[in-house]
Each structure stands twice: as structure tokens, then as C-alpha cells.
């Protein structure tokens, strides 16, 4: 099974296992580390936050299904955890949910803020999302608008 198919099937399984528990997938990595592949799953729970028991429960169920379906093309290690306080922002719904929070965005190419300063990293308060563009009040006092299709990576930042 191709890598993209593995990711797609594991995503489907997590949705099936997690939905009854109120748990959803934040991110999924499937990559080689050393000689083996790693399936790294990051989960969250909207109500009450995810805990170790939730992660262990999903891990057991996912592992059982992976063993039965046996579609993984090679040896792998399964890791299931929370995304942490600097969780990634992947979907439009993530940006909508975390309006007003401090974020860091890295782009594929240099983009200009409102003052014309070009950069690839934008850090500041997420002020909005509309028409595929996120608004950020930068920590330096400027504003920026970043198209989602230019975002290489985005995550929440810890506020002191």
C-alpha cells in the first residue's frame, strides 16, 4: 500500500475510533525513522482536553485494527499523544477555533507585511480568517495577511 493510502486509511480508522469518544485527529505523521516506519498520531478532545487514558484507549483500538487489517507495508512503531501546547493549525476550523491566540506561521515563500517588510515567519495574534487568508497582528506592531495556500507550517505559540 502506498504511503498516501496508508495515511488515508489510518485517518479513517482514527475517525471511526475517536468519534464516539469525542476525540479528533489533529495531525498524523507516517515517516521513516532509522530502519522502521513511525505512525505518529496527535489527538485532541474538544470537551475537557485529552488525557493519557484517552490516548491509550485510542492507541489500543487503533493497534488492534491495524493488526487485523494488516495493510502496513513494513514494520512500524505506533505513537499516540496530544499535540501539546504549541499544537499545529491544519484546517480552517483550527484557525477559526483559535482566533485571538498567539500563533507562528512559516510560509513557503517571502511575503510582505503591511509595512512592506518581507519575511517567511509571522508571529502574532490570529485576528481572522476569510476567503482563504488569515489575519495576524504581528508582535512588532504591524499587521499581515497570509494566504492559507502559502502556509508551510502554522502552530499555536505559548504565551508567558
Swiss-Prot record:
Signal peptide: none annotated. Pfam families: DUF150_C (PF17384), RimP_N (PF02576). Its main location: cytoplasm. The keyword Cytoplasm applies. It is found in: Cytoplasm. Keywords: Cytoplasm, Ribosome biogenesis. The keyword Ion transport does not apply. InterPro entries: Ribosome_maturation_RimP, RimP_C, RimP_C_sf, RimP_N, RimP_N_sf. One of its GO terms (cellular component) is cytosol. One of its GO terms (biological process) is ribosomal small subunit assembly. HAMAP family: RimP. NCBIfam families: PRK14647.1. Required for maturation of 30S ribosomal subunits. Belongs to the RimP family. PANTHER family: RIBOSOME MATURATION FACTOR RIMP (PTHR33867:SF1). This is Ribosome maturation factor RimP.
Amino acid at each position: 500500500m502506498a504511503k498516501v493510502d496508508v495515511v488515508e486509511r489510518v485517518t479513517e480508522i482514527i475517525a471511526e475510533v475517536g468519534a464516539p469518544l469525542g476525540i479528533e485527529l489533529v495531525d498524523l505523521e507516517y515517516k521513516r525513522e532509522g530502519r522502521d516506519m513511525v505512525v505518529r498520531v496527535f489527538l485532541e478532545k474538544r470537551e475537557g482536553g485529552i488525557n493519557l487514558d484517552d490516548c491509550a484507549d485510542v492507541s489500543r483500538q487503533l493497534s488492534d485494527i491495524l493488526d487485523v487489517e494488516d495493510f502496513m507495508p513494513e514494520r512500524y512503531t505506533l505513537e499516540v499523544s496530544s499535540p501539546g501546547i504549541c499544537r499545529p493549525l491544519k484546517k480552517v476550523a483550527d484557525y477559526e477555533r483559535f482566533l485571538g491566540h498567539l500563533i507562528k506561521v512559516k510560509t513557503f515563500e517571502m511575503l510582505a507585511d503591511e509595512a512592506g517588510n518581507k519575511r517567511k515567519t509571522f508571529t502574532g495574534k490570529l485576528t481572522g480568517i476569510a476567503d482563504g487568508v488569515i489575519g495576524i497582528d504581528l508582535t512588532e506592531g504591524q499587521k499581515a495577511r497570509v494566504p492559507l495556500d502559502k502556509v508551510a507550517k502554522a502552530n499555536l505559540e505559548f504565551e508567558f
